[in-house]
UniProtKB/Swiss-Prot annotation:
Keywords: Ribonucleoprotein, Ribosomal protein. GO terms for molecular function: structural constituent of ribosome. GO terms for biological process: translation. PANTHER family: 60S RIBOSOMAL PROTEIN L35/50S RIBOSOMAL PROTEIN L29, LARGE RIBOSOMAL SUBUNIT PROTEIN UL29C. The lineage of its organism: Bacteria, Pseudomonadati, Pseudomonadota, Gammaproteobacteria, Enterobacterales. This is Large ribosomal subunit protein uL29. GO terms for cellular component: cytosolic large ribosomal subunit. It holds the Pfam family Ribosomal_L29.
Length: 63
């Protein structure tokens, strides 16, 4: 997910995206804990996407 794509979204859309990412992160962590996760790079990608969305939400709140 690109930062430019996220900047075009509204606050409501960013909150929805954040919720989806957190759910995905939870599912990936459960798969990793049970040894079922084959693509471990997804954990890092989702974590960074969560950070991107949170950063944009903070920036939009301050503007």
């Amino acid at each position: 997910m690109k930062a430019n794509e996220l900047r075009e979204k509204s606050v409501e859309e960013l909150n929805a995206e954040l919720l989806n990412l957190l759910r995905e992160q939870f599912n990936l962590r459960m798969q990793a804990a049970s040894g079922q996760l084959q693509q471990t790079h997804l954990l890092k990608q989702v974590r960074r996407n969560v950070a991107r969305v949170k950063t944009l939400l903070t920036q939009k709140a301050g503007a």
